[in-house]
Curated annotation (Swiss-Prot):
GO MF annotation list: ATP binding; ATP hydrolysis activity; ATP-dependent DNA damage sensor activity; damaged DNA binding; single-stranded DNA binding
Residues binding ATP: 64-71
Family membership: Belongs to the RecA family.
Species of origin: Francisella philomiragia subsp. philomiragia (strain ATCC 25017 / CCUG 19701 / FSC 153 / O#319-036)
SMART domains attached to this UniProt entry: AAA
Protein name according to UniProt: Protein RecA
Length: 360
């Protein structure tokens, strides 16, 4: 057997044993498109994830510095899930969920299942019970850092509790993983960044809760703040950069950039202008942006305002981008042309004649 055949045999055996997407070539564009996904609500992020959204039946970790947009990303995923008719749960260990902001992002807060647990054990047990029920499509846990072990809560303030949280996470994830796969539920953990003490070389940053989540997560997203967005003198938002640092269902290390506007969420219009200009769906000449030969604005801010007011053109641009960048999810459906009446009558006569011949 040649090396190529032996390798192909091994790859097919691995896929059969561990599932599609468990192994691939890094430059392979044909990723596992048949994996069920929940869209992120951000086109650039759906493209970076490689399969058009977050994979169901998997664990996702989103981590970053404070106010970098981690919770916003999870709420957008919940909104997309609910639009598809799914059921979502939010385990608010930080006790900081803002219903008004969630509603602004498109979340149906009346039907969102929310829990504010007292201990880390309680939070993870609730998550496991929801997953095992099979009736939940997405569970968000905000955040790993707030999953305080019961022993730490009941102990005194100065007591040492080395490794308790890491042990708790390790036990919970061992239990959760099989149930998540079986019920095809998407479980998203929000995590925070801490600094390692005494690191002279390399990256001193790490995430809380030990190493278990790093191993069990199929996708890990690193969220960072970019530059500020100004409305005159005032800062109205900031740029967000998301890096896919781990991806088991598509090639990793891709990046997505978009704008987060304070009090509004992710700016769809800014994303459409940036991606539209990049892929020549929108023409850019100097400071002017044009669509189908018609000028839509001078500068990005004016163009954003135009798209906000003209939703029909905005939807057209969005559809064109989705079909271009995610053809496996948003393929252009060819319309089946109806047969002319003369052909229909001829085929009908032929079928009737064939039936009569069979009877004879």
């Amino acid at each position: 057997m040649s090396k190529e055949k032996a390798l192909e045999s091994a790859l097919s055996q691995i896929e059969k044993q561990f599932g599609k997407g468990s192994i691939m070539r890094l430059g392979d564009q044909e990723t596992a498109h048949d994996i069920d996904v929940i869209p992120s609500g951000i086109i650039a992020l759906d493209v970076a994830l490689g399969i058009g959204g977050y994979p169901k039946g998997r664990i996702i970790e989103i981590y970053g510095h404070e106010s970098s947009g981690k919770t916003t990303l999870t709420l957008l995923a919940i909104a997309q899930c609910q639009k598809q008719g799914g059921v979502a749960a939010f385990i608010d260990a930080e006790h900081a969920l803002d219903p008004k902001y969630a509603k602004l992002l498109g979340v149906d807060v009346d039907n969102l299942i929310v829990s504010q647990p007292d201990t880390g054990e309680q939070a993870l047990e609730i998550a496991d019970m929801l997953v095992r029920s099979g009736g939940i499509d997405i569970v968000v846990i905000d955040s790993v850092a707030a999953l305080t072990p019961k022993a730490e809560i009941e102990g005194d303030m100065g007591d040492s509790h080395m490794g308790l949280q890491a042990r708790l996470m390790s036990q919970a994830l061992r239990k959760l993983t099989a149930n998540i796969k079986r019920s095809n539920t998407l479980v998203m953990f929000i995590n925070q960044i801490r600094m390692k003490i005494g690191v002279m070389f390399g990256n001193p940053e790490t995430t809380t809760g030990g190493n278990a989540l790093k191993f069990y997560a199929s996708v890990r997203l690193e969220v960072r703040k970019g530059g500020s967005i100004k409305d005159g003198v005032d800062v109205s938002g900031n740029e967000i950069k998301v890096k896919i640092v781990k991806n088991k269902v598509a090639p990793p290390f891709k990046q997505a950039e978009f704008e987060l506007i304070y009090g509004e969420g992710i700016s769809l219009e800014a994303e459409l202008i940036d991606l539209g200009a990049k892929y020549e769906i929108i023409e850019k000449s100097g400071a002017w942006y044009s669509y189908k030969g018609k000028k839509i604005g001078q500068g990005k801010e004016k163009s954003k305002e135009y798209l906000k007011e003209n939703t029909l053109e905005r939807d057209e641009i969005e559809k064109a981008l989705l079909q271009l960048l995610l053809p496996q999810k948003y393929a252009v459906q060819e319309q089946v042309q109806p047969e002319p009446k003369s052909k229909q009558s001829k085929s009908k006569q032929a079928s009737e004649q064939a039936t009569q011949d069979e009877l004879i």
